[in-house]
């Protein structure tokens, strides 16, 4: 192989790596983990920033199937992100939801955009743990990320479990600026 061929091969490899990296970032977004402390401001946004009020009026009653889905999703907390992944060795966002619901006898389509058309579209105020939340992480209205409602705090704050490209499977809040701006809608599949 001559020097020109080697350089050309290296350029092609770099273009491929950049393309794959861009696809990963766009396909499942990224997030900061929500702090466990109730007094922490790391998951909140300063009052000067304008965010949508994205709260639920969930009454706190969970069915057995919802509890099972949440328990299964929690098992994967800390699992790394893997583009196209749907196993405990690594998940992308829709791989996580597909796996968790499959473990509970519910088949979901593999892609988040297809999952967004499964079940019943609901107002966020009606959302409860086990429902799916959909996001447009690249802006606009095209679904590119999905998460499972995990908890509804006493003040109505919605927290969800999902596979973040930067931190793997974590719990985030709709009160975080990134997710608040990217939120599209909720679906009930149970």
Segments the model singles out, each with a brief description of its role:
Residues 106-167, 176:
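...with weaker cross-activation on analogous glycine-rich loops/strands in unrelated enzymes
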Residues 60, 79-129:
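Catalytic cysteine-centered active-site loop
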Residues 2-16:
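Bacterial N-terminal signal peptides that target proteins for export
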Residues 49-54, 74-83:
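Acidic/histidine-rich, surface-exposed loop or edge segments in extracytoplasmic proteins
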Residues 23-27:
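C-terminal motif of bacterial Sec signal peptides marking the signal peptidase cleavage site
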Residues 66-70, 74, 94-98, 127, ...:
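Extracytoplasmic/secreted envelope proteins and their assembly/folding machinery
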Residues 2-5, 29-41, 58, 149-190:
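Aromatic- and glycine-rich peptidoglycan recognition patches
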Residues 33-68:
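Post-signal peptide N-terminal segment of mature Sec-exported envelope proteins
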């Amino acid at each position: 192989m001559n020097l020109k061929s080697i350089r050309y091969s290296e350029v092609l490899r770099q273009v491929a790596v950049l393309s794959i990296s861009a696809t990963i970032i766009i396909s499942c977004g990224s997030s900061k983990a929500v702090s466990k402390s109730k007094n922490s401001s790391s998951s909140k946004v300063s009052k000067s920033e304008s965010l949508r009020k994205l709260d639920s009026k969930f009454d706190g009653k969970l069915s057995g199937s919802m509890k099972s889905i949440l328990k299964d999703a929690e098992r994967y907390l800390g699992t790394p992100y893997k583009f196209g992944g749907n196993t405990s060795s690594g998940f992308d966002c829709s791989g996580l939801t597909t796996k968790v619901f499959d473990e509970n006898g519910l088949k979901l389509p593999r892609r988040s955009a297809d999952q967004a058309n499964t079940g019943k579209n609901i107002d966020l105020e009606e959302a409860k743990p086990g429902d799916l939340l959909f996001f447009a992480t690249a802006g606009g209205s095209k679904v590119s990320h999905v998460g499972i409602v995990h908890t509804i705090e006493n003040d109505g704050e919605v927290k969800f479990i999902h596979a973040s490209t930067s931190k793997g499977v974590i719990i985030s809040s709709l009160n975080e600026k990134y997710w608040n701006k990217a939120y599209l809608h909720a679906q009930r599949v149970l």
